[in-house]
Amino acid sequence: MSAFLDKLSGSQCVSLEKCGDVVVSTNDCMIALYCHFCRDLFTQLPEFLRHLQGAHSDVLHFTKEHNVYSVEELMSGEQDDAQEDAHSAGHNSSSGDSRIPAKSEDSRAIDASEDNSDNSPVKSEQKGMQNEINLLAEVTNILLQSKEREHINNESKPENGGFNGPCKKASSESNSLRICDLKSHTIARTSRKRMSMLKNRILRVIDSDVSAKREMKPSEPNYILPITETIQEDNIPKICFETQPKPIPSSSNLSVRKSSLSEPNVSLACTNYAAKKTTLTIPKLLNCTPKSNLPCQQSQVYSDSNGRSETYHISKATSQGSKEMESFPVKITQIDVLPPLILPETSTTPNQKERVNALVENNTVNLYTAQNLPKEKPKKFFKKRGELWMKSEDSPSKSVKITKYRGNPIIVKRVQTSSAKSSPCKTQIRSNDKTKCFASEFNSTKIRKLKMENSIALKKEDPCSNKSIRLSKMATISSCEILKVVGLPAITDQKLEDTLLLDELETMRKKADQFSKIYKKYDSIWNYRKIFPPGKPEFISQKMFALTREVNETMGCNLANSAIKSIINQISVWHYNIYTKCIVLDTISETARHTLKLFSFLPVSFAYFCKCCDDIFTLNEDYTRHLVSQQARYQCTKCIKAFKYRGHFEKHLQNVHP
């Protein structure tokens, strides 16, 4: 390139002048042209050339005015190149497989050439070449259309010649159709078989249902079937009054032997009677001849054990107006064997039972209106609900006292003598319906439940209110004592310094000044939220240990790490409350102003440091929740370390303080 530029500069026709530099930005992948005259950047070459011609023509002395290509001219040149490429691609892609794409590319190239032919400043020779190209494109389109028609006609007519492709396809299609026909035939046959099987099953079920409905259920011994058919008069025999009347049954005939009514015999007799009545009387019901209303009727009971029958004669007596049954036939339908009675150990007389039942009924009826009665003082020993202790005839140690009030129901009171403690037997009677007996106590139990719920809710909020108050008082006392060591008791109790003497006040303020100077050095602790990124908990714990060591050495005290953390938390909370509550400085006491001046370097935002562990919290809610979870039951007196479990505390004593 340098040799080419030397040749151009060496000739007299060409004069080159350096107008700018090419600037490249690697981040944005952009190229720009830098103008030396006005120090501007241009992203496009035509803009840069127009700028030089318009703004710096006095320096450069352009000989020609229009020596810069316009955008339209550049686009027309690019379109001509595209047309030539498309035309060459169309000729190259004129094979049998790519007919349609070639056609589309040629048509697009022709359309583009026709559209841009008017605007492009091309010479006459180029126009002639374009006309020839257009003619060739039209001829190729006509040939392609004719070939497509022939191809469609050839596909519609099956060929028997040497072209094997379509024949194979046709044969494969026919084979596939035959296989499909076979499959459909087998599917239809199997489906017919399944449907016939289902049909047979359904018919069997229907037949079984019909036969089950036709079967008559066995009738009970007392059941009488209604006569549906009419009785013919010819079949009814005439009444013969010449027959001798049968004798009236005696009491011996009506009695039933106990031997014949044993449990297995009676059960068998009942079952046989029901079975025979259903099997024998049903088919003969329509053909039976009605008998006259004789004064006696017979009923037989069959038994399989001894094979003998017993007859029961029942007489009917007719009255003047209507016939009434004076005696009924003895029919045993069911015999149940009851379990043996379990009698209580204490014997009760019938008179005693009647008295007790009467008293219990009176108590259940009248306890509904007993709510307004004056309540007695509760005794030390209470009995269970629903228990009434009455006086028995055998044991004179117990007595019942019944008191009546005006317009009030009877109330049973229990009075026990001194000898009642020695008496071993007690009669205990419970009421059957406890809900009725103790309806008066329902409201009291409801109120008791509400009180219990309220107490449970209070326990959830504050599990031990008195204990928490005592602990809070102890915590304030301990925090005051810890703050006195540092000289800052005014944070918790502002009136405390008013009671001190001047010498004590001066010593306290000196201690506070010393502590503030030491604390100011550790900005990673008091400025935890402002530092970015914040320090790690391990680093801050190391700083906290260093702070405690320095405070103990300079101030001559023996404070633990947890005590220093509590002091820092109290100072930061006190400082935050003063600045957020918008307190006027004139209303604050002198001690508060003095402490504010000492800790003026503290920011408003702060962090909470846990006493038991190295966790740090920025929100008060999270800190309090963590404190509740970290409540310690055991604390070492030597190192003031807290432990939640006794085993951990004992291990600490064995390992650390042997």
From Swiss-Prot:
GO biological process, one term: male meiosis I
GO molecular function: zinc ion binding
Positions with biased composition (Polar residues): 118-127
Subcellular location, principal: nucleus
Subcellular location: Nucleus; Chromosome
Basic and acidic residues: compositionally biased ranges: 100-111
Region (Disordered): 78-127, 151-175
Keywords: Cell cycle, Chromosome, Chromosome partition, Meiosis, Metal-binding, Nucleus, Repeat, Zinc, Zinc-finger
C2H2-type Zn finger ranges: 33-56, 608-630, 634-657
PROSITE patterns referenced in this protein's UniProt entry, alphabetically: ZINC_FINGER_C2H2_1, ZINC_FINGER_C2H2_2
Keyword Amino-acid biosynthesis attributed: no
Keyword ATP-binding listed: no
Any one Gene Ontology cellular component term annotated for this protein: autosome
Family, per entry: Belongs to the Teflon family.
General remark: Drosophilid specific gene duplication generates rgr and tef. Teflon has a function unique to Drosophilids.
Function field: Specifically required in males for proper segregation of autosomal bivalents at meiosis I. Expression is required in the male germ line prior to spermatocyte stage S4. May have a role as a bridging molecule maintaining adhesion to hold autosome bivalents together via heterochromatic connections.
Protein name from the UniProt record: Protein teflon
Encoding gene, per UniProt annotation: tef
